[in-house]
């Protein structure tokens, strides 16, 4: 029987087939999202067992960019320096090139300096960092393993599971020994990818487009890509030919590892019959020595799950949103899921989370997933809509004119949204949210390429430096934090008492008026994930009601409207 068709596990089966283990959270999937969740839970003192059918090695990295927001999480976990020092050359140019091939005709480039001298945002203490999955995953794995709360079990496959009401029972098999074991957990979280078996077993459907285009990645080693043309060195070279965009070459490690991506492969594409060497030669525009290390066929998708949970089982990462890699939102969106769910699971397990706190996970994260999935598709549509210019590679005047025309098209500021997207990275907000107190102020525009810091409830609490090397966001994480921006300390005994009664962790921090203009209120309550829950000039009359709402304890469920994913072929943006 298939994994989906197998009967639900009974306690009797579990006892017969192997040993039983108990934990608070069972995590299925050991990619970056599953590992991030294990770290987030461990950081909060929650015990977890992570199972993954693979060996934990990353032969073919799918991601190589860690966003500023993910770096902020890494900062809280204590590993941001390790990510920065993982190995990416600090003097490597942050450059995007558009050309007929790596060594062919170039018609446009974006230069943004290097990791050490590029223009940095004032909106965050951390910044985007190139760190391929071959470095990032092992870094997360080792950090997770150091936590006494965490158990990582590779070569271990979830065979079946059952939500029995008070807990989840998962039967797993050790693929090396063939032995079965039962893991009992208060909750289970599936971080098992776009083809999530757990999502299928739960019967949760997806909305969107399952096949925007068929793609292939060719991974290769080459130390001579830019030999003799160092001025062309780039993190990515978009390949544009007579029929438009046909692929891109990107650096994986800033040295000798590369990925060639090719788009719009035929539906019957067979990677085994594919001439990868010819494709690499065409992309490089020169016959240089290189070694193919892998070929990976994949489908570009635009999907969001209709539900993010069922009972005691939750879904994170690609299991609930599959998006085009353009813009680098995939893994980073998944890690945001893990952080949002992580503090809510911890609150529930520690006894202070209300009945509706875990339901707010889907209500907050699904709109962000729809937003990011659609933006990734839109950005890819923008690039793929570059016109087909037949003479683009010609050496005559017609070719020169065609390349000039393409260069003029690429001057459109919208093409920068692929890598200039701080609004997407930092500007996502939980508005509306049942556990954030709404206010009548006008929300800031939700731009892609620019970001205006705001402390409006639901938003990420703004960054500001308190002292050398210490950001205001370094105050957030363990529990709720009440920021007091008044000249003299405000009396907030009612809120402190209410939080103590409900066993909600709360710290009051007197900042003073220096950053009140940024937060636009005298008092601001920040959640454990660093998002604003409430703000005001004084405490509300009923402090207990405020505490109950932000911990998800209401008289009845609060309905939240969730947008639908754009369920159609991607928009073709006219830029001609």
Where are these regions (language model features)?
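Extreme N-terminal leader/targeting segments of oxidoreductases
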Residues: 1-25, 40-44
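Conserved mid-domain beta->alpha element of the FAD-binding
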Residues: 29-39, 45, 140, 190, ...
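Conserved FAD-binding catalytic core of PHBH/FMO-like flavoproteins
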Residues: 81, 142, 169, 187-300
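Active-site-adjacent segment of FAD-dependent monooxygenases/related oxidoreductases
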Residues: 59-143
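C-terminal helical "tail/cap" subdomain of flavin- and related membrane-associated enzymes
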Residues: 2-5, 346-459, 465, 470, ...
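A conserved short coil-to-beta-strand element within the FAD-binding core of flavoproteins
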Residues: 154-168
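Glycine-rich FAD pyrophosphate-binding loop
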Residues: 42-63
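Core beta-strand elements of the Rossmann-like FAD/NAD(P) dinucleotide-binding domain
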Residues: 21-23, 177-187
């Amino acid at each position: 029987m298939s994994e989906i068709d197998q009967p639900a596990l009974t306690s009797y089966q579990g006892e017969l087939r192997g040993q039983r283990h108990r934990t608070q959270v069972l995590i299925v999937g050991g990619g970056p999202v599953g590992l991030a969740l294990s770290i987030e839970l461990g950081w909060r003192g929650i015990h977890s067992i992570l199972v993954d059918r693979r060996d934990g090695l990353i032969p073919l990295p799918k991601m190589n960019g860690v966003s500023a927001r993910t770096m902020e999480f890494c900062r809280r976990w204590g590993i941001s320096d390790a990510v920065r020092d993982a190995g990416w050359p600090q003097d490597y140019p942050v450059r995007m090139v558009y050309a007929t091939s790596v060594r062919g005709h170039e018609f446009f480039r974006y230069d943004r300096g290097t990791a050490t001298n590029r223009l940095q945002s004032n909106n965050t203490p951390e910044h985007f960092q190139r760190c391929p999955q071959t470095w990032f995953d092992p870094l997360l794995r080792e950090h997770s393993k150091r936590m006494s709360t965490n158990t990582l079990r590779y070569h271990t496959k979830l065979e079946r599971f059952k939500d029995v009401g008070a807990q989840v029972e998962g039967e797993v098999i050790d693929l090396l020994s063939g032995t079965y074991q039962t893991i009992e957990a208060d909750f289970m979280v599936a971080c098992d990818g776009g083809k999530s078996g757990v999502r299928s077993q739960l019967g949760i459907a997806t909305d969107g487009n399952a096949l925007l285009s068929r793609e292939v990645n060719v991974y290769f080693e080459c130390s001579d890509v830019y030999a003799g043309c160092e001025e062309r060195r780039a993190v990515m070279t978009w390949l544009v030919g007579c029929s438009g965009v046909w692929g891109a070459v990107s650096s994986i490690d800033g040295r000798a590892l590369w990925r060639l991506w090719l788009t719009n492969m035929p539906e019957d594409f067979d990677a085994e019959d594919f001439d990868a060497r010819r494709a690499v030669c065409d992309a490089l525009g020169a016959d240089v020595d290189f070694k193919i290390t892998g070929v990976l066929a994949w489908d570009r998708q635009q999907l969001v799950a209709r539900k993010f949970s069922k009972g005691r089982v939750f879904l994170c990462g690609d299991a609930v949103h599959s998006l085009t890699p353009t813009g680098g939102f995939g893994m980073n969106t998944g890690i945001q899921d893990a952080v949002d769910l992580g503090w809510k699971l911890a609150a529930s397990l520690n006894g202070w989370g209300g009945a509706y706190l875990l339901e707010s996970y889907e209500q907050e994260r699904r709109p962000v997933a729809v937003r990011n999935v659609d933006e990734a598709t839109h950005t890819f549509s923008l690039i793929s809509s570059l016109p087909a210019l037949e003479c683009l590679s010609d050496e005559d005047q017609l070719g020169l004119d065609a390349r000039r025309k393409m260069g003029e098209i690429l001057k459109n500021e919208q093409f920068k949204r692929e890598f200039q997207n701080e609004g997407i990275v930092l500007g996502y907000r939980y508005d509306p949210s049942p556990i954030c107190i709404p206010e009548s102020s006008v929300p800031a525009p939700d731009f892609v390429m620019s970001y205006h810091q705001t402390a409006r409830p639901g938003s990420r609490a703004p960054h500001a430096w308190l002292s050398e090397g210490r950001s205001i966001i370094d105050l957030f994480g363990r529990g709720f934090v009440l920021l007091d921006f008044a000249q003299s300390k405000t009396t907030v005994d009612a809120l402190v008492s209410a939080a103590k009664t409900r066993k909600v962790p709360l710290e009051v921090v007197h900042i003073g008026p220096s950053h009140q203009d940024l937060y636009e209120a005298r008092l601001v309550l920040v959640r454990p994930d660093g998002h604003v829950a409430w703000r005001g000039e004084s405490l509300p009359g009923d402090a207990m009601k405020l505490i109950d709402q932000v911990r998800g304890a209401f008289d009845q469920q609060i309905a939240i409207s969730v947008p639908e994913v754009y369920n159609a072929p991607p928009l073709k943006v006219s830029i001609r």
